[in-house]
From Swiss-Prot:
Gene3D superfamilies from the UniProt entry: Ribonuclease H-like superfamily/Ribonuclease H
Protein name: Ribonuclease HII
Gene Ontology MF term list: manganese ion binding; RNA binding; RNA-DNA hybrid ribonuclease activity
Main location class: cytoplasm
Keywords: Cytoplasm, Endonuclease, Hydrolase, Manganese, Metal-binding, Nuclease
Family: Belongs to the RNase HII family.
Keyword Acetylation: no
Task of the protein: Endonuclease that specifically degrades the RNA of RNA-DNA hybrids.
Length: 239
């Protein structure tokens, strides 16, 4: 039986970072855009989603591209302006913590991917997503297992999202001192858990996450008990 192209099922990492995109381009399905997110598992800060379409002749200029989690911070920062310069189009979306709480992480992730693709200044012929399907896109799409290490456009989107979020979390560390956002970027490290317990949650913490909810519940309970223990206030007048 002949194999149809593009495939209709989830595919796994190809033999090279640009193999899949090149095949799609040769099939007349370009430009190919990749979409990826950062901050899905963090208990504070936004979920950041980026979409990026790379030109077929720009791969050599971005030879260091890889899954952003495998790159050093220095390499990511070096790649960020290069991706912005050489991309056909890119768009970064920030989903705030309150929206993550309201929608749930997965639904917020899907919505962020839709917004990121819709925000591209160049309409892609095909979209590759990292790991799971993105329903509701206006163009054909395909999920790629380990996509940020399998397709250059997804790797580029991963770097854009990661650097954008990291920079925001460093700024947030100044806005909400004491939590250590510049270090752990909102993830549930031991230091973050200790700070959260001591300070209580700030407006950027995700109340839908159980560790934040537990601290918030304890803080609210302690505040209620303190109010109940306060003596009656003196009042002027007759009674």
């Amino acid at each position: 039986m002949a194999t149809t192209w593009p495939p209709r099922t989830v595919i796994r990492k190809s033999s090279g970072l640009r193999t899949l995109e090149s095949a799609l381009q040769r099939s007349g399905l370009g430009p190919v855009a990749g979409v990826d997110e950062v901050g899905r598992g963090a208990c504070a800060g936004p979920l950041v989603v980026a979409a990026c379409a790379l030109g077929p002749n720009r791969y050599e200029s971005l030879a260091a591209l890889d899954d952003s989690k495998k790159l050093t911070e220095k390499t990511r920062e070096k790649l960020f302006p290069l991706i912005c310069r050489y991309a056909l189009a890119y768009h970064v979306v920030f989903i705030p913590s309150v929206e993550v709480d309201r929608r749930g992480v997965h639904v917020a992730n899907i919505e962020g991917m839709r917004r990121a693709v819709a925000g591209l200044s160049v309409r892609p012929g095909y979209v590759l997503s990292d790991g799971f399907r993105v329903p509701g896109l206006s163009v054909p799409s395909l999920p790629v297992i380990g996509g940020d290490a399998a397709a250059a456009c997804i790797a580029a989107a991963s770097v854009l999202a990661k650097v954008s979020r990291d920079r925001l979390m460093v700024a947030m560390d100044t806005q909400y001192p004491g939590y250590g956002f510049a270090e752990h970027k909102g993830y549930s490290t031991r230091a973050h858990t200790l700070a959260l317990t001591q300070l209580g949650p700030c407006p950027e913490h995700r109340r839908s996450f159980i560790n934040v909810r537990r601290v918030a519940t304890r803080s609210n309970g302690a505040a209620t008990a303190e109010r109940e223990a306060d003596p009656p206030q003196e009042r002027d007048g007759t009674g």
